[in-house]
Amino acid sequence: MIALRKIGIIGGTGVENASAFGKLAPLTVETPFGQARCLKGTAAGHEIYFLARHGLDHSVPPHKINYRANIFALKKLGVTEILSFTAVGSLNRGLPPGTFVVTSQLLDFTKSRV
């Protein structure tokens, strides 16, 4: 028998709609870093927790995203795998829109922020 998973999906700009997971139940999770809101659904019998990075109403600007609360909430819900989508721009003409990129460098401006 295949073990059922608890999967977290973090959607960025352009990936705010989780309707593919059927009927969704909103959840608010309390964390030491503040509240995180997500939607719970199912897919192929697995529990899916959809977290909209910019909020369910897309009202949170990038510099105000509470990343620590979001990740803590998924951990608290028992999520063991996370699939995260994001959309960014590029100044490199060799990377036209629609190019799939795996990053090897990261500038993290979220340190020491609650």
PLM regions and their residue ranges:
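Metabolite-binding pocket within alpha/beta catalytic cores that recognizes anionic/polar moieties
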Residues: I2-V114
